[in-house]
């Protein structure tokens, strides 16, 4: 029961995700700046994934953010990048995690990408989460 309370306290308020997506949509519509929302999903019960998310958060730029959904899922918002650049950033972060911590087992993490562009019509939480965590949109 104590573990459950710890896990729940590490999850963010759902309003934060709505605000982060609103900020990305505003950057796109007001300034024609693309942003990429990255879904981070691990296996249920994976003890290493929270460490990966902590590492990602420690390496982010000031304009980037992480939203923790559950112990095994998070959303990363990268401002002023396109999808190709976001994929490079995620790869660099994963390599940095591996180099810094040399885990005995490589973390099993799936990433989904949603690019917020100036002409993107729907940046609602529901639409973005479906795009991020649908099995066919991960690699």
Stretches found by the model and what they are:
Residues 34-38, 68-82, 102-132:
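A short glycine-enriched loop-to-beta-strand structural element that forms part of the catalytic core
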